[in-house]
Curated annotation (Swiss-Prot):
Record keyword Ligase present: no
Biological role stated in the UniProt entry: Histones H1 are necessary for the condensation of nucleosome chains into higher-order structures.
UniProt protein name: Histone H1
Comp. bias (Basic residues): 16-27
Molecular function GO terms recorded: DNA binding
Compositionally biased tracts (Basic and acidic residues): 49-61, 69-89, 117-156
A GO cellular-component term linked to this record: chromosome
Signal among keywords: no
Chain coiled-coil ranges: none
Keywords: Chromosome, DNA-binding, Nucleus, Phosphoprotein
C-alpha cells in the first residue's frame, strides 16, 4: 500500500501546485490591471510637468546671468565711445551711446547725463574749429582767382596785338 500512498502524496502535491498556480494567475491579473493605470499615467505625466517647471526656474536664473552680461555690454559700449573719441566721425559714437542708455538702469542714467553734457561741449569745440578752417580756405581761393584773371587779361591783350 506504500505505492498507493505515494501516489496519493503526489496527488496532494499536484493539488497544492494547482492551488499555487491560480494564485500566480491572480497576481498576473493584478499585473494586467496596473497596465491600464500605466495608461492612466497621465497623472504620472503631470509629475514630470512639475519637473519641467523647475527648468523654467533655472531659465529665470539664466536671465539673472543675462543682466550681468548686459552690464558687460554697457562697459563695452562705453569703451567703444572712448575709443571713437579720437575719430572725426560723430555718427559712429551715437549708436553706442544710445545702446548704453538703453542698457543702463534708471538709477545710473542720472549719473550718465553729466557725461553726455561734457561730450556735447567737445562737439561744440570741434564745430568751432571746422568753422575757422572754412573761413581760411575761401580767402585763399579768392586770392588765387584774382591773380588768374589778371594773367588771362594780359595774354588776351598781347594776342590781338600780334594779329594786327
Amino acid at each position: 500500500m506504500a505505492p498507493r500512498s505515494s501516489t496519493s502524496k503526489s496527488a496532494t502535491r499536484e493539488k497544492k501546485d494547482h492551488k499555487k498556480a491560480p494564485i500566480k494567475k491572480a497576481i498576473a491579473k493584478k499585473d494586467t490591471k496596473p497596465t491600464p493605470t500605466k495608461g492612466k499615467a497621465a497623472s504620472a505625466s503631470t509629475t514630470p510637468v512639475k519637473k519641467d517647471v523647475t527648468p523654467v526656474k533655472a531659465d529665470t536664473k539664466k536671465k539673472i546671468h543675462k543682466t550681468k552680461t548686459m552690464k558687460e555690454t554697457v562697459s563695452d559700449a562705453k569703451k567703444t565711445v572712448h575709443a571713437a573719441a579720437g575719430d572725426k566721425k560723430l555718427s559712429k559714437k551715437r549708436p553706442a551711446k544710445e545702446a548704453a542708455k538703453k542698457a543702463i538702469n534708471p538709477g545710473k542714467k542720472a549719473a550718465a547725463q553729466p557725461k553726455s553734457t561734457k561730450k556735447e561741449v567737445k562737439k561744440d569745440n570741434k564745430t568751432a574749429k571746422k568753422e575757422t578752417k572754412k573761413d581760411h580756405k575761401p580767402a585763399k581761393k579768392e586770392a588765387k582767382k584774382e591773380t588768374k584773371p589778371a594773367k588771362k587779361d594780359a595774354k588776351k591783350s598781347s594776342k590781338p596785338a600780334k594779329k594786327n
